[in-house]
């Protein structure tokens, strides 16, 4: 099965290269797609330079998809998913710290071996703040592999912005698709407050949680509606 890694990135020029360096070392990947989500910094230039540097190597090719305006994480992920013909796609955040090739393989294998429709990477042993967040809400992890057609069929997924992971989780639960939670040791990511400063970081985090809440309410309602329709058919 063809496998593509998709890296949605917004203003990640200082961090994205270390993630790409790891992804190109994973033997299970056939291509890597960076989706530059309307960044205002040099994210596109860094990714394109990396792609050129590795073009002649035996590593999986890297290509950069530039979105003219910011569509949010869900929009960037959808753009990447529809830009490939890979049967399996894997999403990785552009600000990861401690990612290793074996982490990538561990997340991919349950899907490639036909055990599940989606595998979600859950941080452990990175640092307390991200470990705690993923213990409390592992279903919003951005590191996951899944069958591509199951992602692109989700209604409105391209409009979910930061709520994309909760939308994915609710949709898969509603459809009873099998999902595996895969522990990945030693990974964390750069916090918004570290990227933007305390005040702007807190505001960005608040906005992110609001988008997650909106997606939760929308897809939870869709789940309730489907359940009611099924009950009505059975009457």
Predicted regions and their residues:
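Short, well-formed alpha-helical segments that are part of the catalytic scaffolds
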Residues: 12-25
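Glycine-rich, basic loop-to-helix element that forms the pyrophosphate-binding segment
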Residues: 67-84
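Short beta-strand-to-loop element that shapes/binds the nucleotide-sugar donor at the catalytic cleft/hinge
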Residues: 119-133
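Hydrophobic helical membrane-anchoring modules
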Residues: 159, 173-235
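Short aromatic/hydrophobic "clamp" motif used to bind/position activated sugar donors
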Residues: 89
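Cell-envelope/extracellular polymer assembly enzymes that use nucleotide-activated donors
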Residues: 2-4, 31, 167
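A conserved acidic beta->alpha catalytic loop
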Residues: 36-45
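Conserved donor-nucleotide/metal-binding helix-loop-beta segment in metal-dependent transferases, i.e.
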Residues: 101-120
């Amino acid at each position: 099965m063809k496998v593509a890694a998709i890296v949605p990135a917004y203003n990640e020029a200082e961090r994205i290269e270390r993630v790409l360096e790891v992804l190109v070392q994973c033997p299970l990947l056939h291509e890597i797609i960076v989706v530059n989500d309307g960044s205002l910094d040099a994210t596109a230039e860094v990714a394109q330079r990396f792609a050129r540097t590795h073009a002649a190597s035996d590593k999986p090719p890297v290509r950069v998809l530039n979105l003219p305006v910011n569509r949010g994480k869900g929009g960037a992920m959808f753009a990447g998913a529809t830009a490939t013909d890979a049967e399996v796609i894997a999403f990785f955040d552009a600000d990861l710290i401690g990612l290793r090739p074996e982490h990538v393989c561990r997340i991919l294998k349950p899907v490639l071996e036909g055990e599940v429709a989606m595998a979600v990477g859950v941080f452990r042993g990175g640092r307390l703040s991200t470990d705690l967040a993923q213990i409390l809400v592992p279903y919003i992890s951005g590191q996951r592999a899944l069958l591509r057609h199951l992602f692109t069929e989700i209604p409105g997924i391209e409009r979910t912005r930061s709520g994309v992971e909760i939308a994915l989780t609710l949709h898969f639960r509603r459809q009873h698709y099998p999902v595996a939670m895969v522990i990945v040791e030693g990974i964390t990511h750069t916090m918004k407050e570290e990227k933007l400063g305390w005040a702007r970081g807190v505001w960005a985090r608040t906005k992110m949680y609001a988008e997650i809440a909106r997606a939760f309410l929308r897809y939870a309602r869709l789940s309730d509606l489907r359940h009611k329709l099924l009950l009505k058919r059975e009457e």
